[in-house]
């Protein structure tokens, strides 16, 4: 595979995984849970 394709897939995977975690972390800090 092309290195650029692998890099894009990696960034997309990281974004999908860290997105909900960041929102969850911010919710905890704000005490909205």
Swiss-Prot record:
It holds the Pfam family PSII_Ycf12. A core subunit of photosystem II (PSII), probably helps stabilize the reaction center. This is Photosystem II reaction center protein Psb30. The lineage of its organism: Eukaryota, Viridiplantae, Streptophyta, Embryophyta, Tracheophyta. It comes from the Eukaryota. It is found in: Plastid, Chloroplast thylakoid membrane. Keywords: Chloroplast, Membrane, Photosynthesis, Photosystem II, Plastid, Thylakoid, Transmembrane, Transmembrane helix. GO terms for biological process: photosynthesis. InterPro entries: PSII_Ycf12_core-subunit (IPR010284). Belongs to the Psb30/Ycf12 family.
